[in-house]
Every structure is written in structure tokens, then in C-alpha cells.
């Protein structure tokens, strides 16, 4: 069990992708003082110490893999707890929920909560990013016409521009900007993706190079780099994708979510190495898995 003092000691490394502020009394007090409506949104008139302790307990639950508890504790505080709650809920949905309908419901719940409370959390890059992340994951699995009808691509592009402006060293945001164009190509094809949304291989390379230079050694970022190369280039970048997936699989995880990411990378690495042995056979099914394009014959 992670203690509050251990949480503080390891916080900077745990959040090395984002440099997210530690929720101690000084930080939370300043946050509430500068955002009176945020303070008013906390249910049951909780004291400052209660809010701080609950936030820290929520993060402890997240880092030790108790995602449901972390989510519940975060939501019990209202919008100020959405950062840890959204992170926990999207992680559970993305890595552990096998049922498609339930997975989609979890992502949609995050989007609905964010839509209702986003005016309270403009300061919070964690909340904003994982609302984006839920939309991105949902967009991967629902049909292209629905994605287009809801203008998800435009909303996600705008969210990333704003996040990058506010937090230019955020590794999650930089990686997402690279993955975004690859995801568009995966969903719509190269021609439609380029003509409609300007998706390009250069964007993938540009943002992942920025991530690489920051050298944070985050398994999920390496995993997503590998996936993006395959979505954008297919077999041409299979060996490079394998290198990035291997890197992801060899990271020593520091907490529960990273352990899930490393485990997932190891599983995908085995698949990709088998595909490589077969000279690319099976790659189309790999790339289109869990999408509405899964059963269509073209790459």
C-alpha cells in the first residue's frame, strides 16, 4: 500500500509525462482561492484538509491499480477531482474492460461529465486531456459516419491545439498530436484523411521526435508510436514499429497503469514479431482490430 508520504516522494516520477502539480494544502488552497466557482462546486462543504486528503487518496488508489475507488473518490469532490477520476476511468476502459458497450459507456460518461463541468476545469490539463483521450478512444471504435456527424475530429484537433499552447512540454499531448493524424488515416484512409483533415506522416514524425527528445521513457508513448507508424505506413515501417514496441515492453513499470501498458506492449510485440515472420501477413487485421473497418477487405 502506497502511503501519502510515498506518494509525495514519487510524485514527480509518476507524473513525469505531465509535471502535474502535487495536491498539497498550498496548491489546493491557491487553486480554490483563484477559482471561487470551483470551490463552490465541491459537494457537502468539505474542508480544505478533507479535499486534499481525498485527492491524495484518489491518486494512491490510481497508482496502486484500484481504478474504481480512484474514480469514485475523484467524483466525490466534484470537478476538482475530475483529473484523477477521468484518468482512472479511461485507463480502466482502455486496458481492462472487455465488453465493447460498457467500454463505450465509460468513455461517453467522461465526455458527458466534462461537457457539464468544463468551465470549472479550464486550469486542469489532466482533466482536459483525458476528456480528449476518451473521445479519441471512442472514435477508434465507432463508425466513421458517427465520428464525422459528431465532429469528433474537429473537436479533438482543437483540444490538442489548446492543450499544447497551455502545456507545451506535456508528453501525453505531444504524443497525442502525433497519434491523431495516424488515427485519422486509420479511420478514413490516407487520401480522405489528408484532404479532409490535413493528416500527414510528417506530423506523426514531428511530434514523436519532440517526445523522443524529452526522453521520459514512458511505455504507453512508445507503444502508441509503434501503433502510429503502422496506421500511417503499414508494412513499410513494421520493423521500426517493432523496435518501439520492444522499448515499451522493456520499461520497468513504476505503478499499476504502467504495468498494464508494459503487459499490453509485450502482447502486441509477440503479435508483430509473428506478423514480421510472415512477411506482413496479418498486419491488416492487426491495424483494423476493434474498428468498424475490421471486416472490410481493403487496407
Each language-model region and where it sits:
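N-terminal alpha-helical interaction modules that lie
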Residues: 1-140, 153-167, 242, 247-299
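Alpha-solenoid repeat scaffolds
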Residues: 80, 84, 96, 184-188, ...
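A cross-domain feature marking catalytic cores of carbohydrate-active enzymes
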Residues: 90, 175, 223
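Short coil/turn linking the two alpha-helices of tandem helical-hairpin repeats
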Residues: 91-100, 136-147, 183-194, 226, ...
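Alpha-helix N-cap and loop-to-helix initiation/capping positions
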Residues: 101-105, 147-151, 195-203, 236, ...
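Eukaryote-skewed repeat-based solenoidal scaffolds used as protein-protein interaction platforms
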Residues: 118-129, 134-192, 201, 206-214
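Long, repeat-rich segments with strong aromatic
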Residues: 203-260, 271-277
Amino acid at each position: 500500500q502506497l502511503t501519502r508520504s510515498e506518494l509525495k516522494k514519487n510524485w514527480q516520477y509518476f507524473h513525469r509525462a505531465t509535471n502535474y502539480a502535487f495536491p498539497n494544502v498550498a496548491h489546493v488552497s491557491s487553486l480554490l482561492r483563484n477559482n471561487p466557482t470551483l470551490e463552490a462546486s465541491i459537494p457537502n462543504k468539505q474542508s480544505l484538509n478533507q479535499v486534499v486528503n481525498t485527492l491524495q487518496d484518489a491518486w494512491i488508489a490510481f497508482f496502486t491499480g484500484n481504478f474504481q475507488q480512484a474514480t469514485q473518490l475523484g467524483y466525490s469532490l466534484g470537478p476538482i477531482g475530475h483529473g484523477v477520476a477521468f484518468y482512472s476511468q479511461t485507463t480502466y476502459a482502455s486496458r481492462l474492460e472487455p465488453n465493447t458497450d460498457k467500454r463505450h459507456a465509460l468513455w461517453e460518461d467522461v465526455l458527458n461529465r466534462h461537457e457539464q463541468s468544463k468551465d470549472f476545469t479550464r486550469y486542469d490539463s489532466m482533466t482536459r486531456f483525458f476528456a480528449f483521450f476518451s473521445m479519441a478512444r471512442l472514435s477508434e471504435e465507432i463508425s466513421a459516419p458517427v465520428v464525422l456527424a459528431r465532429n469528433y475530429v474537429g473537436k479533438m484537433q482543437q483540444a490538442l491545439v489548446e492543450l499544447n499552447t497551455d502545456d507545451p512540454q506535456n508528453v501525453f499531448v505531444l504524443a497525442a498530436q502525433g497519434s491523431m493524424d495516424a488515427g485519422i488515416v486509420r479511420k478514413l484512409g490516407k487520401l480522405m484523411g489528408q484532404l479532409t483533415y490535413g493528416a500527414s506522416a510528417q506530423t506523426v514524425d514531428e511530434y514523436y521526435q519532440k517526445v523522443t527528445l524529452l526522453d521520459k521513457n514512458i511505455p504507453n508513448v512508445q507503444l502508441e508510436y509503434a501503433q502510429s507508424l503502422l496506421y500511417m505506413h503499414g508494412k513499410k515501417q513494421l520493423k521500426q514499429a517493432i523496435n518501439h514496441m520492444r522499448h515499451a515492453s522493456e520499461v520497468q513499470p513504476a505503478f499499476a497503469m504502467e504495468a498494464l501498458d508494459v503487459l499490453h506492449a509485450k502482447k502486441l510485440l509477440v503479435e508483430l514479431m509473428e506478423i514480421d515472420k510472415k512477411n506482413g501477413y496479418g498486419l491488416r487485421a492487426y491495424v483494423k482490430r476493434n474498428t468498424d473497418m475490421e471486416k472490410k477487405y481493403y487496407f
